[in-house]
Every structure is written in structure tokens, then in C-alpha cells.
Regions:
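N-terminal phosphate-binding or glycine-rich loops at protein starts, especially the Walker A/P-loop
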Residues: 1-44
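Short, glycine-rich nucleotide/cofactor-binding loops
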Residues: 7-17, 147-157, 296-302
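Short glycine/serine/threonine-rich phosphate/pyrophosphate-binding segments
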Residues: 15-19, 82-96, 100-114, 125-129, ...
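Glycine-rich phosphate/diphosphate-binding loop of Rossmann-like nucleotide-binding domains
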Residues: 17-18, 30, 35-37, 149-211, ...
Length: 326
């Protein structure tokens, strides 16, 4: 089945070089009839493409002369920059010209544009960004990590359902355990939104709900899905990134301070562990709940991130995750 994947060439800190490089690298792993669409200023993209060898029938360019910066206000920027790469990306999906869209650009603008153009799945109130956290007990899906910072109980309940489907069919977890992020495991803990969400989740017999969880439980692998609002989820995500990076730097420093020979001995082990926790290996995070396949990547995405995001979007689309959610 032919798939058309549109990529925001101007999204992220390393655009367009790394985005285009990652797009080109993904070609070998895709089916011969899959097509890639690079969205952004045509002159800049075409100039970059001259550095790559590829089948011109497989990679096309959709001109989008404007770019939304990472620090711009999402709704306002989309209104002013109708020819921005994010806006054009969303339009391609709406018109049925792209089966999946990918961007490492302004997260708020991506969420707003994709939701506005692609619309939500039936009965889904608000979409949520689902990120996979690797643990030694298996992958944990955290949803939401930034799409919706002011959740209602129904939003958290629906995040649990959607992330559970994602965990089961993408990560192959047979009966995902769902935990609700709170400030304590006891039922009395948490604000009113969390308490009401817990009642909704617990009342659904189709959900394998284990109750409240705390921040430390995620990396312990206590659950397979952690549900929270976008504010809490984003703090957890950024804190974990910094923690992992700082921890590895500290270990590297201590090993080198001892003996270079000792450091070299542990290098393969450290490399394997670091790879396990490297977000570049996982590509992007799906925006669950929109009526289509949308993947949002880290702002610091490299070519490897984009390549993996493209492959992840194909997997999401091919396995018909949205059909399973509905």
C-alpha cells in the first residue's frame, strides 16, 4: 500500500539540513512505492537536495515560504503565517494529499494546526502527545506531554484509552497497566481533576487500571501507560532528559578520572545503555486523537530522529491505530 509522508523541512533547531538528511536516509527502509513530501521554502530545500542522490519520483517538494519560530504564539502565528511549513503540512493532510505528517517545529502550532485541519477522531475531546519512556521493565507510554496543559477529567480518561491502544498494538504489551499520575498512591491524593478522572477510569472494566502512581514509578516500570495533563507530562519529559544526560556525563567523568583503560572497557556497555534512553532512537511522538497520522518530534531532532519518526509514522498508519482507538 502506497503511503505519502509529509515532513516539515523547517521544523526544529537543526532545520533544514538534518531534516532533509533524515528524510533521505529513510528511503532505503521504506517500500519502493512510498512517497515523501518535504514542506518548506522550495528554493532552500531544492538547494539542499542537490547534495543527495535520490529518485525524483519518490521525493517531492511542497512550497511553504514562511516559518513559525519556536518562540511564537501558536494560534496567532498560524493566523498570520498561512503559508508556513506547519500550516501547509496540515493542509496536505486535510486534502488527503498526505497520509502522515511529521514536524519538529513549534509544538503548540503543530497541535493547533493538526487539530484544526485534521479534526479529532469521533468522541475524542482533546488530542494528546504520547511519548515512550524506556525502562528496564519495558517501555512506558506517557500521555499527555504537552498538547493540553489544562485537562478535564474526560481528557485524562481518554488519554488512558488511546495510550493503552498504542501500547498494545505498537509496543506489543498484551494488557497494558494504566496508572494515573498524582502526588501519592492513595485515593485521597490529587486535585479534583485527578480524582474525577480516577473515577472515570476505574469505572471502565475494559481498562487495566492500577490506580494512582507517582513520578518515580514511571522509570521503575510500575505501569505500561502513565496518564497526566500536558503540563505535568512535559515537566516529567524534560526532567528525565536532563537526568539521563547528567547521569551519563557524571559516570563518564568518574570513569575517565580513574583510568582511561577502565573507561574504554565500559564504553560498549555505556553506549548500549545510552542508546536505550536516547530519544533519537524513538523518532517522534504521535498526536493521539486526531483523525490522521501526526508525529511531533523533539526540537533538537537530528537526521536519525527524523528517519525513525518517518518509520514510526508508517508503522502507526499501517497498523491502523486510529481505527482501533475508535
Amino acid at each position: 500500500m502506497t503511503m505519502r509522508i509529509a515532513i516539515d523541512a523547517m521544523g526544529g533547531d537543526n532545520a533544514p539540513d538534518e531534516i532533509i538528511a533524515g528524510t533521505m536516509e529513510s528511503i532505503q527502509a521504506l517500500a519502493p512505492d512510498d512517497r515523501l513530501i518535504l514542506v518548506g521554502p522550495a528554493d532552500r530545500i531544492n538547494a539542499q537536495l542537490e547534495n543527495h542522490e535520490f529518485d525524483v519520483d519518490r521525493v517531492t517538494v511542497a512550497d511553504a515560504p514562511e516559518v513559525i519560530g519556536m518562540d511564537e504564539i501558536p494560534i496567532e502565528s498560524l493566523r498570520k503565517k498561512v503559508k508556513s511549513s506547519i500550516a501547509v503540512l496540515a493542509k496536505l493532510a486535510k486534502r488527503g494529499q498526505a497520509d502522515a505528517v511529521i514536524s519538529a517545529g513549534n509544538t503548540g502550532a503543530c497541535v493547533a494546526a493538526f487539530q484544526m485541519r485534521m479534526r479529532n477522531l469521533p468522541d475524542v475531546n482533546r488530542p494528546g502527545i504520547a511519548v515512550v519512556f524506556p525502562t528496564f521493565e519495558g517501555p512506558v507510554v506517557v500521555c499527555d506531554v504537552g498538547a493540553n496543559i489544562a485537562c478535564k477529567p474526560i481528557n485524562l480518561y481518554q488519554y488512558g484509552i488511546m495510550a493503552s491502544v498504542y501500547s498494545k498494538h505498537i509496543l506489543q504489551v498484551e494488557n497494558p497497566r494504566i496508572g494515573l499520575m498524582s502526588i501519592g498512591q492513595e485515593d485521597a491524593k490529587g486535585n479534583e481533576v485527578v480524582k474525577k478522572a480516577r473515577e472515570l477510569i476505574r469505572a471502565d472494566s475494559n481498562i487495566n487500571f492500577i490506580g494512582n502512581i507517582e513520578g518515580r514509578d514511571i522509570l521503575r516500570g510500575v505501569c505500561d501507560v502513565a496518564v497526566c495533563d500536558g503540563f505535568v507530562g512535559n515537566v516529567i519529559l524534560k526532567l528525565t532528559e536532563g537526568l539521563v544526560d547528567g547521569l551519563f556525563k557524571a559516570i563518564k567523568h568518574e570513569l575517565l578520572a580513574e583510568k582511561l583503560r577502565l573507561a574504554m572497557k565500559f564504553k560498549p556497555v555505556m553506549t548500549r545503555i545510552y542508546k536505550k534512553y536516547d530519544y533519537n532512537e524513538y523518532g517522534g511522538a504521535p498526536l493521539l486523537g486526531v483523525n490522521g497520522t501526526a508525529v511531533i518530534c523533539h526540537g533538537a531532532s537530528t537526521a536519525k530522529t527524523i528517519t525513525n519518526a518517518i518509520l514510526a509514522s508508517k508503522n502507526f498508519h499501517t497498523k491502523k491505530i486510529n481505527h482501533k482507538i475508535v
